[in-house]
Amino acid sequence: MSSKANHAKTVICGIINVTPDSFSDGGQFFALEQALQQARKLIAEGASMLDIGGESTRPGSSYVEIEEEIQRVVPVIKAIRKESDVLISIDTWKSQVAEAALAAGADLVNDITGLMGDEKMAYVVAEARAKVVIMFNPVMARPQHPSSLIFPHFGFGQTFTEKELADFETLPIEDLMVAFFERALARAAEAGIAPENILLDPGIGFGLTKKENLLLLRDLDKLHQKGYPIFLGVSRKRFVINILEENGFEVNPETELGFRNRDTASAHVTSIAARQGVEVVRVHDVASHRMAVEIASAIRLADEAENLDLKQYK
């Protein structure tokens, strides 16, 4: 699906991290009632989708055992589903967690390993006829790259051969993303996942340099040319905050201004993404991002706007 074919407004996916250690909101929604209250808040602010995660993927985070992850996310999914038909995404790379979450009422699997971390994941998604976000994961493709070393290991075992990893090291970032997606999409096809159930995520903030992050964001339309909707997560990512810091803005999250600046900057990126026709943005602060989406989508869909004159504005 190209941006030209996307005649709908960008969907806002609100984040609920049911973890004690996520980089932005770890611990805030660890209890079931807190998570449910946050879900209600995000929906009221305009989220059409919620992304539920039970394991932090920030630099330095620890592996969460499968049963523990299931115990964190399934009660939250069941509670949300009991009172809302909002789309629910389960943020996990483990097939057993995905299977339990889908059975509990989730609609979509958001796999940060792009189906490459657990060889059973593609079959779980196919069996459930669920949608799946396949993320480009540079940490897995370039584990020895300086930008990857601070991240935890993703996946069971080694996903790529030593020769593949050596070849990946020399590829420009956009070529590396294409190579990764070719492998991931082949796995999806082999398992029987329907192409219309696939979204692609460029993996912003995962093992990328500042320049690589910016290049991938600038050229999102090239990713659209692969024929799939885009799912984008840039909210409160470190490289966005670094740009603010380099230019003298307050970014300390302990201050009201610093915290607000992080969301304002993230919303600016969402505006650029929505202008390019990105289908889904994954965000923490739905209210600010919704404003960005409304304005950017109105500009992108200008041909469909009402031709009001000044007298008709009230």
Curated annotation (Swiss-Prot):
Keywords recorded for this protein, A-Z: Folate biosynthesis, Magnesium, Metal-binding, Transferase
UniProt enzyme class: transferase
Reactions that this protein is recorded to catalyse: (7,8-dihydropterin-6-yl)methyl diphosphate + 4-aminobenzoate = 7,8-dihydropteroate + diphosphate
Domain Pterin-binding: 10-294
Biological process, per Gene Ontology: folic acid biosynthetic process; tetrahydrofolate biosynthetic process
GO cellular component: cytosol
Binding site for (7,8-dihydropterin-6-yl)methyl diphosphate: T57, D91, N110, D201, K237, R282, V283, H284
Binding site for Mg(2+): N17
Pathway this chain belongs to: Cofactor biosynthesis; tetrahydrofolate biosynthesis; 7,8-dihydrofolate from 2-amino-4-hydroxy-6-hydroxymethyl-7,8-dihydropteridine diphosphate and 4-aminobenzoate: step 1/2
UniProt superkingdom: Bacteria
Cofactor(s) listed in the protein's UniProt record: Mg(2+)
Family annotation (Gene3D superfamilies): Dihydropteroate synthase-like
One example GO MF annotation: metal ion binding
Coiled coil regions in record: none
EC code(s) of this entry: 2.5.1.15
Additional observations: The sequence shown here is that of sul-s (wild-type). The protein of the spontaneous mutation to sulfonamide resistance (sul-d) has an insert of 2 AA.
Oligomeric and partner information: Homodimer or homotrimer.
Family note: Belongs to the DHPS family.
Function: Catalyzes the condensation of para-aminobenzoate (pABA) with 6-hydroxymethyl-7,8-dihydropterin diphosphate (DHPt-PP) to form 7,8-dihydropteroate (H2Pte), the immediate precursor of folate derivatives.
Record protein name field: Dihydropteroate synthase
Species per Swiss-Prot/TrEMBL record: Streptococcus pneumoniae serotype 4 (strain ATCC BAA-334 / TIGR4)
Lineage: Bacteria, Bacillati, Bacillota, Bacilli, Lactobacillales
Gene: sulA
